[in-house]
Amino acid sequence: MNILKKIRSHLRYFFLNFFGVDIKFVKKNIFKNIETPEYESINCLYRSQGILHIGAHRGSERYVYDWLGKEVIWIEANPTIFNELKKNLVEFKYQKAYKALLHSKKRDDVDFFLSSNDNASSSIYDFSKDFKDNKLFFQNKIRNISMINKIKLKAYTLDDLILKNSIDIKKFNHWVIDVQGAELEVLKGSIESIKLCNSITVEVSTENFYKEGSKFNDVNEFLNKFNFKVTKDPKRNHEDVIFIRNDIN
């Protein structure tokens, strides 16, 4: 997920519209044929009181969040990447990082696979056989990615992490989840916290990229039970989708 790249160049359009200058989003970049960011994605960030970002990596979106004046909680599982994340957040007073692997339940020994692409596709799941055999491609692009190492980590639920650290979760009512196939596990561990969430951006897959990993239909079915509805079904096999709680004005 690269929210920074998708949003950075379009924030000016949002604020011009907000102040009464009518600018329309084009559907495609005519040179690269890449869809522009959804208006709703920017709107969710703008309307939120604060942001909970699960699967932080190095926190590349920190500048956007800071520019919007948002408090942010970052959660990253990879110990090595987490140390770099902490350094990147030093100058951001209202952004705080926690090192934790989130799961549906507390566990002492969870496999965590480290990917070759700067750990960006690291997951509690290994890649599927179809992906390893080059039968599946992220967004139909050939990418030479593999899991190059495996470590053991302790796992926590989001609800436990919130309680343990006395986080006022109602202040962080837009969530970003980027956990490479573990979306359903993370959500199952947030039964209490999710009641105070208004909107969620989730990176989902529609195909089996990760062995035993969740897919869009799994995430959609789960969130429907908590009164969240997807704004638009995914068009590609691996992309961000936005869920908004139905009773939000």
Language model regions located:
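Phosphate/nucleotide-binding beta-alpha loop and adjacent structural elements of enzyme active sites
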Residues: 1-249
